[in-house]
A protein has these predicted regions:
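Polyanion-binding surfaces on beta-sheet-dominated domains and ring/shell assemblies
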Residues: 1-165
Length: 165
């Protein structure tokens, strides 16, 4: 962990920014008021998709924190507007794939991270041609795969949260 060195690596700083942007998109900041919620994301067994796993798990932690603020009377209602999930996709050996494992991610020709809300709207989209450039059609195909994956993750989040925020 970077905290042991008291310094963030560039990769950790980028992940931190992505997670922060993604989670802020879920919240009505005015309703939250003058509060800070710290979400610490440790991916204990990262096998590719660390950034998006941090977003998806971080959202559950955020929802639980907001629920506690409501239960303890600090907020009248939850400031969360939307569920947020993130998933990665890529092109490996010319084949579009969802949720790449490390062995696939390390040889991906194209890598894409997609964060969405439960309405299917894109919050963050990061795509990189690792071994080659990619076409708009390929990007759209990867985004469709990510939308499917995000819908599956949304079901898991709702189940973990008892179906409510």
């Amino acid at each position: 962990r970077d905290i042991a060195k008291l310094k963030l690596s560039p990769r950790s700083a980028e992940i931190q920014r992505l997670v922060g942007r993604s989670l802020r998109a879920a919240v009505d900041m005015q309703a939250l008021g003058e509060r800070t919620i710290n979400i610490d994301c440790d991916v204990l067994q990262g096998d590719g998709g660390t950034r998006t796993a941090s977003v998806t798990g971080g959202f559950v932690a955020l929802a639980l924190a907001c629920r506690k603020l409501v239960e303890e009377g600090y907020l009248g209602s939850t400031p969360i507007r939307h569920f947020v999930t993130g998933v990665s996709a890529g092109i490996v050996d010319e084949q579009p794939m969802l949720d790449l494992q490390y062995s696939e991610d390390s040889r991906a020709q194209v890598d894409l991270n997609c964060v969405m809300n439960e309405l299917g709207e894109i919050i963050e989209l990061q795509g990189t041609g690792e071994g080659r450039a990619f076409t708009l059609n390929e990007q759209q195909e990867l985004v469709r795969l990510c939308a499917k994956g995000n819908r599956e993750l949304l079901k898991i989040q709702k189940e973990a949260l008892g179906g409510k925020l």
